[in-house]
């Protein structure tokens, strides 16, 4: 299952990268993130592996993040893994002009279990809406004066 989203950001690409590249900021635009722990490699660099723990209501879950590509300041790719799916995310930051950057996110889910192969695609709208909310929170954070 694939989808792509775009969001214009009213800041320079360098400012966007600086905010995006700081894992402490991730907790601001992903408020359900409660812990980010790098287990191997250099955080944010290709080959780095981290465990991200989220809490949503009474439910707590973890994802393994593997950084697959980094080209500062225009691209950052990761794969998130759990027992149900691998989720590849390609983030690209394109200069529109000096103070505007377009954030493109290309997402692909590869479902692992039989049940998720059947029901996962029916949840595409939910995945898109959740991603749009996260992107919008990042926009509000990074554009704050």
Regions found by a protein language model. Give the residues of each.
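Hydrophobic ligand-binding cavity/cleft-lining segments
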Residues: 1-40, 45
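A generic structural signal for beta-strand entry/edge sites
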Residues: 2, 73-75, 98-102
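Short, surface-exposed coil-to-beta transition loops
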Residues: 2-4, 60-64, 86-90
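Short structured motifs
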Residues: 3, 35-37, 75-76, 88-90
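Solvent-exposed residues in well-ordered beta-strands and their adjoining turns
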Residues: 8-12, 53-57, 68, 94-96, ...
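Amphipathic alpha-helical segments that line or abut small-molecule/effector binding pockets
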Residues: 14-17, 132, 136
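Glycine-rich portal/gate segments that line the openings of hydrophobic small-molecule binding cavities
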Residues: 37-84, 133-145
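Beta-strand/loop substructures that line and gate deep hydrophobic ligand-binding cavities in soluble
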Residues: 81-133
């Amino acid at each position: 299952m694939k989808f792509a989203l775009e969001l214009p950001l009213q800041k320079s690409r360098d400012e966007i990268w600086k905010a995006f590249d700081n894992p402490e900021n991730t907790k601001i635009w992903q408020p359900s993130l409660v812990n980010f722990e790098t287990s191997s490699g250099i955080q944010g660099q290709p080959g780095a592996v981290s465990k991200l723990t989220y809490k949503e209501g009474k439910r707590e879950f973890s994802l393994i993040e593997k950084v697959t590509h980094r080209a500062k300041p225009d691209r950052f790719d990761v794969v998130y893994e759990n027992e149900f799916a691998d989720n590849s995310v390609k983030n690209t930051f394109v200069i529109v002009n000096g103070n505007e950057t377009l954030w493109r996110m290309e997402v692909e889910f590869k479902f692992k279990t039989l049940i998720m192969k059947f029901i996962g695609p029916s949840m595409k709208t939910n995945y898109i809406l959740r991603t749009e909310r996260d992107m919008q929170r990042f926009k509000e954070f990074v554009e704050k004066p």
